[in-house]
Amino acid sequence: MIQQESRLKVADNSGAREILVIKILGGSRVKTGNIGDIIVATVKQATPGGVVKKGDVVKAVVVRTKHGLHRKDGSYIKFDENAAVLINNDKSPKGTRIFGPIARELRDDDYMKIISLAPEVL
């Protein structure tokens, strides 16, 4: 579960390494986010020469959580880290590569570009 002030790793090559959650979008009183939720965050660590810089306010979609996710078939999936992919306003990723596995639930939320760039979909 992702909440305000959570720090997430960035799973793409947009130039950001770590982001801090400012707000979870969707409704007026959403307190926690899970895989597939859009968040507003600020860049806390960045690589030199990247698309985004430290201090930039960005939108991102959560792709991995330590908390995990229950699926309809009864299975349960959880990851070793909390990670997100930076996106534009039209839900397309800012980076050109995605690192690490991505949950299959992103397919239901129309993130097909992220799914196609991911090396592994679980």
UniProtKB/Swiss-Prot annotation:
Report the coiled-coil segments: none
What keywords are annotated for this sequence in UniProt? Ribonucleoprotein, Ribosomal protein, RNA-binding, rRNA-binding
| Listed PROSITE patterns | RIBOSOMAL_L14 (PS00049)
The molecular function terms in GO held by this entry are: large ribosomal subunit rRNA binding; structural constituent of ribosome
Q: Which GO terms describe its biological process?
A: translation
Write one Pfam family the protein is assigned to.
Answer: Ribosomal_L14
Any one GO CC term of this protein is: cytosolic large ribosomal subunit
Q: What quaternary arrangement does the UniProt entry report?
A: Part of the 50S ribosomal subunit. Forms a cluster with proteins L3 and L19. In the 70S ribosome, L14 and L19 interact and together make contacts with the 16S rRNA in bridges B5 and B8.
Biological function:
Binds to 23S rRNA. Forms part of two intersubunit bridges in the 70S ribosome.
Write out the similarity annotation.
Belongs to the universal ribosomal protein uL14 family.
* Protein name per Swiss-Prot or TrEMBL: Large ribosomal subunit protein uL14
Species of provenance: Limosilactobacillus fermentum (strain NBRC 3956 / LMG 18251) (Lactobacillus fermentum)
The protein's gene is named rplN
